[in-house]
Amino acid sequence: MTARLRPELAGLPVYVPGKTVPGAIKLASNETVFGPLPSVRAAIDRATDTVNRYPDNGCVQLKAALARHLGPDFAPEHVAVGCGSVSLCQQLVQVTASVGDEVVFGWRSFELYPPQVRVAGAIPIQVPLTDHTFDLYAMLAAVTDRTRLIFVCNPNNPTSTVVGPDALARFVEAVPAHILIAIDEAYVEYIRDGMRPDSLGLVRAHNNVVVLRTFSKAYGLAGLRIGYAIGHPDVITALDKVYVPFTVSSIGQAAAIASLDAADELLARTDTVVAERARVSAELRAAGFTLPPSQANFVWLPLGSRTQDFVEQAADARIVVRPYGTDGVRVTVAAPEENDAFLRFARRWRSDQ
């Protein structure tokens, strides 16, 4: 006889991360190609001296550093820290949604939203995208008296698009004040062209807005799992109540603080990624691909029924990309030589179609 598990888990998929294949070019996980700065490495080395001790469960120094980084309108009480922003997504579901409640988000979007909602016994309301972008009008129309939480993934993963600052502000104004709006900004550092929203201003103006950010992408600490939320102190207190103790390591906290100290240098690296993004996008379009304008560190190829063939042939060429069913393929913008190899493959594949 096996243990009796919750029956609703039977229908949940197991998360499948981007593959790592020895010797292959990995363009599947939106990782930065830049390693930690020397100052961050030094902080990591120092932190190893105390790994026999539990980490600071309250992340006191990191929260203080984040508050300083965010500006004078924010205090540590406005900040929650988690084991990556994905953990904070789950915590937000936990503190807002009960059995039968609804959580609204565009689809396709971050693939862990649906299972996180279902594990809570709540109902995911997946609103189709328009032109690969969140349709905020349709999302607003999907709000009911059972809606407890709305996710706006901006830039959207995996389609790379953003909703404009004005449209996002109007949406926030229109959502009832008792519904929490989570603006998931894992890739916000890559937004250009005047499309970056004043999300922190929305937090200041609306008690029901929380912003999620991460050190995994632009800051290059994906392996240390550090994310944070910015919101009203009542929301932050609720997140802290469901935080699993000690899940943010002492090494991660030290690395994050050192990264904030070097933020200007680290964020300057995003200009290199953005330049490569423009080059890769232009060359893909010149080769005959259709793709939306990216504001992230990846591009989206809506290949439909040809998705699996593209992925398999890329693997044969020792290039690993990320498929999303029969919707399309997400491709990380990587180092120039890696991007060149991908572009050579993409042109060959396109010429055979």
Swiss-Prot record:
Gene Ontology terms describing biological process: L-histidine biosynthetic process
Key words of the record: Aminotransferase, Pyridoxal phosphate, Transferase
Chemical reaction(s) catalysed: an aromatic L-alpha-amino acid + 2-oxoglutarate = an aromatic oxo-acid + L-glutamate
N6-(pyridoxal phosphate)lysine carried by residues: K217
Needed co-factor(s): pyridoxal 5'-phosphate
E.C. no: 2.6.1.57
Transmembrane segments: none
One of the Pfam families matching this protein, by short name: Aminotran_1_2
Function: Aminotransferase that catalyzes the conversion of aromatic amino acids and 2-oxoglutarate into corresponding aromatic oxo acids and L-glutamate.
Family: Belongs to the class-II pyridoxal-phosphate-dependent aminotransferase family.
HAMAP family cross-referenced by the UniProt entry: HisC_aminotrans_2 (MF_01023), Phe_aminotrans_2 (MF_01513)
Quaternary structure and interacting proteins, as annotated: Homodimer.
Protein name: Aromatic amino acid aminotransferase
Species this chain originates from: Mycobacterium bovis (strain ATCC BAA-935 / AF2122/97)
Gene name of this polypeptide: pat
